[in-house]
Amino acid sequence: ISIEKTTGEVFIATENGLVSFISGGTSTQGDLSKVYAYPNPVRPEYDVLGYSNLNNINKGVKLKGLTDNVNIKITDVVGNLVGEAQSNVNYRSSSKNFAIDGGTAIWNGKNLSNNIVATGVYLFLISDLSTFETKTIKVLIVR
């Protein structure tokens, strides 16, 4: 078994040949210096917001380049908490609106009340719980 670190594609060698699938997760990084969000800005025609199933890797707002022990809070510009996830706690299979899978986090654009967020700027406040390194990423949602 091998994982392509940048795309998250998993390769499995069997006696009948090689099989691969896109997992959606990626390898973790050593620090937060290369974290980025996409799509950004999030435009209506991208059709990535509001889905309840985070297992569809083509939907949602993603953060890539995370370390292996992070806590991420999403707030609006006023400071209202919109979402929160922690490594090794909030998995994509956990039926949450925000989850972390290895070096990738995925958010479906819903707030803590399970409503799709309004147009605006949202802050992803990333904290590495091991090194105390922090980083803030801004994402613009246009509805």
Regions found by a protein language model. Give the residues of each.
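Short, glycine-anchored, charge-dense loop/turn motifs used at functional sites
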Residues: 70-82, 122
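C-terminal tail/sorting-segment detector
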Residues: 121-143
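Short loop/turn segments immediately following beta-strands, especially the blade-tip
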Residues: 21-31
